[in-house]
Amino acid sequence: MFKKVFTKKVVPFATVTTIALGSLIGVTVYDKVEAEQQPQVQTAKQTQNAMHAEAVEQIKKENPDIKNVIFLIGDGMGPSYMTAHRYMTDNPKTPERELTTFDEHFIGVQTTYPEDDKENITDSAAAATAMSGGEKTYNNAIAVDNDKSEIKTVLEQAKENGMSTGLVATSEITHATPASFGAHDHHRDNMNEIANDYYDEMINGEHKIDVLLGGGKKNFIRDDRDLTQEFEKDGYGYVTNKKELVKNKDEQVLGLFADGGLDKAIDRSANTPSAEEMTKSAIKRLNQNENGFFLMVEGSQIDWAGHDNDVVAAMSEMDDFEKAFKAAIDFAKKDKHTLVIATADHSTGGLSLGTNDESGEGIYNWSTAPIKAAKKTPDFMAKQIINGADVEKTLKQNIKLKLKPEEIESVKQAAQTNDETKIDNAIEDIFNKRSYTGWTTSGHTGEEVDVYGYGPGKEMFSGLMDNTEQAENIFYILEQMKQNK
C-alpha cells in the first residue's frame, strides 16, 4: 500500500517548478525583513510572478473564444485536504496512486492574505471579495473595501453584459462566499440584509442573480419580509427540495433547501440536492441565454468540517465538491466555450495527515479505513445522542468498526454533560486517533491554495498568482466577450 507512486504525468515541468518554488515563498515573502534576509525567496517570487504574467499576456494575444465562466470555490480546501482526498479515492488494488479529477486539471497556486490591520490570515469574506472584485479588504467585508465603499463584482459585470448569473452553495446562500459575489455589506453576519440585496439591487432593471440555490430559508422568510413571495411575484420559481428542483423548469429560480446550511453530504436525505445536482440544474437554466453565463459554486462545508476538526465530514464534503467540479468540466468539454476554474479561499483547521501516537511519538502513517467506516458524521451522531438515543447503539449503528470499550466510555462520559459539542468532540476524537489525523487550530491557516482549470483561457490562471488576480482575469475575459459580440 505504501509503495504506491504516481505513474502518470500530472502537469508540465514548468508548472511543477512553479509549485516547488511557490512552496518556498509561503507567507513570509510578504514580510520585508524576511525577504531581505532571504534574497533567494524574493527571486523565486519574482520568477513566479513573471511566469504567471507571461502566461496571461500570451493568452490575451490568442483571444480565446469564451462564452461562459464557471468559478468553483472549495471553502477551506487547503493542500492537505487535496492529499487526503486522493488517499480516500485511491484504488488499493492498483500499484499506482490514481489521480483525482482535481489532479487532472491542476494549473497553479494562489496566495490568500487579506488587507486587514489586525489579522494577516484571511476569512472567507475577504478572500471571496478579492476573488469577486479584485481588491484586498478586511476580514468580514462583503464586496466592500477598507473604506466600506462597494466593489463591483464579476457577477455584476456579467449581468451588465447581458449574461445570466447564478450562485450555488451548500451553506446559506447568503453566507460570506456567495454574498461577496452578489451583494455588498460591511459585515458578513448581516445575512438578512444580504438576502435583501439579492432582491433589491438591480442591474439594467433586472435582478442581478438569476439562479440562487443553497440553504438559508430563515434569511428569506422573516417576520418583516418574505423574499420568496417577492421573487415569485417577479417570475422566479421557488423550490425547497430535490424533487421540486428537478420538476421546475423556470430559467430563474430560488432554491432554499434548509433553514440554515444544508446537512453534510454524508448526512443528507435523498430529497436534498447535492452540490453536483445543484450545479447541473444551474448550468441547464443559465445556458439558455445566448449571451452566456457566469456561475459561482461553493463547496461551503469543507470549511465547516475543518473548523470542527471533523475528518469524516471533511472527506464527505470533498467528495461532494469534486463531483460538482466534474459536472462543470463535463459540461465544458461538450460546450467547448466554457472556462472552468476551481480553487479555495484558504485552508481550515491545520489538517495534517499523520500525527503523534498517545506516547508522543510521530506516526508515519495515515489511515483511511476508519474514516470510510463512518456512515454518518460525528455531528449527526451527537445530535441523536443529545436527543435521547442510546450512546453505544448509536455508535455501533453508524460506525462500521469494532469499537474499544474505552472509546464507547469516552462518549458516554461526554453524554453525561448534556453538551452536544463535547459529545461531538468525543466521537471526532475516535476517528482522528484511529486515522492518525492531526489538527492545529479551529480557525483558518495562511498557506497558498491550489488552482485548477479547464477550457479556453485557463492558462491565465496558471503558476503562482494572488487571489485578486482571479477577478482581474475574469473581468478581462468579460470585457473581451463584450467586445467580441
Task: Give residue ranges: language-model regions.
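N-terminal secretory signal peptides that target proteins for export/translocation
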Residues: 1-6
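Sec-dependent N-terminal signal peptides
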Residues: 7-24
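Cofactor-binding active-site loop characterized by glycine-rich and histidine/acidic residues
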Residues: 13-15, 34-39, 61
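Sec-dependent signal peptide cleavage junction
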Residues: 23-39
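Mobile, glycine-rich extracellular loop/lid and propeptide segments
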Residues: 41, 45, 49-85, 131-147, ...
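A post-motif C-terminal structural segment
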Residues: 61-67, 77-82, 87-121, 125-129, ...
